[in-house]
Amino acid sequence: MEIVLGVGGGIAAYKAALLLRLMTEAGHGVTVVPTANALEFVGAATWEALSGRPVRTDTFEAVDEVNHVRLGRRADLVVVAPATADLLARTAAGMAPDLLGNVLLTATCPVVLAPAMHTEMWHHPATVANVALLRERGVTVAVSYTHLTLPTILLV
């Protein structure tokens, strides 16, 4: 299975490294698409070492391949972990300020978002509305009880 692992810019980004390792050990091909803020928590070298592939961050890299469209279309699954409140809001609004946003808009496969944020942010009416809208559109929002860790369902 070809998986795009989007990584949001929250402290839980380091846990996505474990998720990536589990995906690759299970035999999946994984392309990591971190946000700029995610790279502040976990560097590109870590993602590349664990995936065996170059990290994708630039919408305009590999323009001849239409990188921002190809990644979303070729994936069998897109997982975003952690999905910060900001990333949930941008996704719900259909915004694509970076490569990950473009991938989410062009994905024709199942999309799973794993929220990770402080409880106050999770319960904010804007976040609640964004999650409801995403679910209405068919996006799976996998919820943990602490919202600071990646949902256990993603590690299975």
Name these PLM-found stretches.
Residues 85-96, 121-124:
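Glycine/threonine-rich flexible loop motifs
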Residues 25-27, 106, 136:
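Residues at the C-terminal ends
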Residues 146-152:
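Conserved small/polar residues in nucleotide/adenosyl-binding loops
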Residues 32-34, 57, 80-81, 113-114, ...:
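General beta-strand structural signal in soluble alpha/beta enzymes
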Residues 93-107:
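A short, gly/pro- and small-residue-rich
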Residues 45-90:
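Glycine-rich oxoanion-binding loops at beta->alpha junctions
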